[in-house]
Amino acid sequence: NNTKQIEAIVIACVNTHIEYLKNLVKDYNIFKVKSIIAGGRTGQESIIKALEEAKKISESNKDIVLIHDGVRPIIDSKLIIDNIECVEKYGTSITCLKQRETTIISKSHENV
């Protein structure tokens, strides 16, 4: 909401959380959220649904679309702007961050 280069936000989430999320958006005055939709069975399906929704509210087929997963919710305006500038220059962009989760490999294929 604080990044001036962002004009609209579409959120795909678990169907049972839509009303709760709408209330959060209202309570925190996140006015750039234009649509909250039910996501799909997978992350990929949720992305497709969000892109279809974004296309409905887009004013131009030349708009830049950024996709952000909710697993790493804390990003700053600089990262968003860097991605936009990269898309403007190269036509695409992807952000990679150092892994912070714990990765475990089970050689016995049993639960950890």
Describe each PLM feature range.
Residues 50, 68-69, 98:
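Residue-level signal for inorganic ion chemistry
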Residues 74-112:
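Conserved core of the sugar-phosphate nucleotidyltransferase
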